[in-house]
Amino acid sequence: MGSFSIWHWLIVLVVVLLLFGRGKIPELMGDVAKGIKNFKKGMTDEEAASADKTIDGKTVEHKSDEVR
């Protein structure tokens, strides 16, 4: 009972096909692909926005003859 045989997987496949139908599975996979694509697009947009951000800073002048 510890491992699944080919018959277990065939029964699971038949149950999934009966529950969702033949037309619903490709639609679900398309929705998953669109979600992944939008997630990747959002990540690249966020990285581009953070790279464009400028930070105001002060210039610190040091004397060249000072020794620390």
UniProtKB/Swiss-Prot annotation:
Residues 53-68 have a biased composition (Basic and acidic residues). It is a single-pass membrane protein. The chain crosses the membrane at residues 1-21. Keywords: Cell inner membrane, Cell membrane, Membrane, Protein transport, Translocation, Transmembrane, Transmembrane helix, Transport. Part of the twin-arginine translocation (Tat) system that transports large folded proteins containing a characteristic twin-arginine motif in their signal peptide across membranes. TatA could form the protein-conducting channel of the Tat system. NCBIfam families: PRK00720.1, tatAE. This is Sec-independent protein translocase protein TatA. It comes from Sinorhizobium fredii (strain NBRC 101917 / NGR234). The gene is tatA.
